[in-house]
Curated annotation (Swiss-Prot):
Gene behind the chain: NA
Species per Swiss-Prot/TrEMBL record: Influenza A virus (strain A/Swine/New Jersey/11/1976 H1N1)
Transmembrane segments: 13-33
Main localization of the protein described in the UniProt heading: virion
Species lineage: Viruses, Riboviria, Orthornavirae, Negarnaviricota, Polyploviricotina
Cofactor(s) it depends on: Ca(2+)
Intravirion side: 1-12
Superkingdom, taxonomy of origin: Viruses
Protein's recorded name: Neuraminidase
Length: 469
């Protein structure tokens, strides 16, 4: 084969290889186009998923503490339908209290990232119950926890997390800047009320579904404050009560009616010689009942009941089983203030059943320790100190603190009545213990008409922490 033939042969082979390569590239392009067309066609014509529920789980490890960020069930083909919580039912008949939640946040906080907080409370929508709490802008076992015994500071915020979970930066939702707060759900959205600012000019900021909708300026310029527990929603309207004025004398008290976070009406109570602070409120047959703290002069608790037009009645729980702390020993009650040993107080609650009343109170008459529930069948209207049932919640030797009411609506439970529930704050740290911080965990109970247990469910944290030594 001469030189020209070799050149022609090599050229032919190269040409054939090039043509084959070109054909392969064209084939790849055609296959890619066909694949894209098939995928696009499938997206345009989605198939119906045979499963009714799809579950997504996101899990994160933080400082060797396992935190389940979310566990959300999504019903295929279904959306969350807003409703209006009616609030027209009566309270469910109950014979005792079943434990509902315990977050153990102080115990967990010795190792994990847990908020320093106080004033926890619980509120439920028609879909879930959440724990709300006032943080100090600090974590347990950290240097910024120093001095958090202080009630009011610019670092305090209202946050919330799923009920029963220890409140951490990884499972909590910011709600408002606040050192006094309330929150509730009307079936369509969350209303939050956060009070912050100077003692002589604080402002309450109202948010509906996270958006600022209204404000309330302090009208007496003496520490505007609100419930530290849930507000009440009935038929699309929500209600709260606020205090402005002295903590040890006659103050001013206002009822507020709100719709979608906007104030539509307010009135000032005509309540001489009464003192209302930190009211625990609940709905009952279309009305609102609030049981409050008298920090001025009473061992028993004041109440205010009002309808949706804010027409109200006021009084004190008549029972000789006194509910405040500090308080006198049980004895002769009064339908007005029981003045013996009545100065100072603690947030608390009661549930009215006709002439009877469930009274929640500390076991100690002088310190915030222990907790018990007492059923006085005539205690709302009669002044004797007899009662028919007592259920132990926290032992006398263990710390308690604030307590308050919340309810579960029929739209959540499927029952035909409103279930009464309560929470108890378990305060740890200063001023009673040798720490640099003050914080708390919480437990909650709900009323049932079946078997219950008397026991003690204390905070249980072993103090002091490393930061305190």
């Amino acid at each position: 084969m001469n030189t020209n033939q070799r050149i022609i042969t090599i050229g032919t082979i190269c040409l054939i290889v090039g043509i084959i390569s070109l054909l392969l590239q064209i084939g790849n392009i055609i296959l890619l186009w066909m694949s894209h067309s098939i995928q696009t066609g499938e997206k345009s014509h989605p198939k119906v998923c045979n499963q009714s529920v799809i579950t997504y789980e996101n899990n994160t490890w933080v400082n060797q503490t396992y935190v389940n960020i979310s566990n959300t069930n999504i019903a295929a083909g279904q959306g969350v339908t807003p409703i209006i919580l009616a609030g027209n039912s009566s309270l469910c008949p109950i014979s005792g209290w079943a434990i509902y939640s315990k977050d153990n946040s102080i115990r967990i906080g010795s190792k994990g990232d847990i908020f320093v907080m106080r004033e926890p409370f619980i509120s439920c929508s028609h879909l879930e119950c959440r724990t709300f709490f006032l943080t100090q802008g600090a974590l347990l076992n950290d240097r910024h926890s120093n001095g958090t015994v202080k009630d009011r500071s610019p670092y305090r915020t209202l946050m919330s997390c799923p009920i029963g979970e220890a409140p951490s930066p990884y499972n909590s939702r910011f709600e408002s800047v606040a050192w006094s707060a309330s929150a509730c759900h009307d079936g369509m959205g969350w209303l939050t009320i956060g009070i912050s600012g100077p003692d002589n000019g604080a402002v309450a900021v109202l948010k509906y579904n996270g958006i600022i909708t209204d404000t309330i300026k302090s009208w007496r310029n003496k520490i505007l404050r609100t419930q530290e527990s849930e507000c009440v929603c009935i038929n699309g309207s929500c209600f709260t009560i606020m205090t402005d004025g002295p903590s040890n004398g006659q103050a001013s008290y206002k009822l507020f009616k709100m719709e979608k976070g906007k104030i539509i009406r307010s009135i000032e109570l005509d309540a001489p010689n009464y003192h209302y602070e930190e009211c625990s409120c609940y709905p009952d047959t279309g009305k609102v009942v609030c049981v409050c703290r008298d920090n001025w002069h009473a061992s028993n608790r004041p109440w205010v009941s009002f309808d949706q037009n804010l027409d109200y009645q006021i009084g004190y729980i008549c029972s000789g089983v006194f509910g405040d702390n500090p308080r006198s020993n049980d004895g002769k009650g009064n339908c007005g203030p029981v003045l013996s040993n009545g100065a100072n107080g603690v947030k608390g609650f009661s549930f009215r059943y006709g002439n009877g009343v469930w009274i929640g109170r500390t076991k100690s008459i002088s310190s915030r320790s222990g907790f018990e529930m007492i059923w006085d069948p005539n205690g709302w209207t009669e002044t004797d100190s007899s009662f028919s049932m007592k259920q132990d919640i926290i032992a006398l030797t263990d710390w308690s603190g604030y307590s308050g009411s919340f309810v579960q609506h029929p739209e959540l439970t499927g029952m035909n009545c409103i279930r009464p529930c309560f929470w108890v704050e378990l305060i740890r740290g200063q001023p009673k213990e040798s720490t640099i911080w003050t914080s708390g965990s919480s437990i909650s109970f709900c009323g049932v008409n079946s078997g219950t247990a008397s026991w003690s469910w204390p905070d249980g944290a072993d103090l002091p922490f490393t930061i305190d030594k």
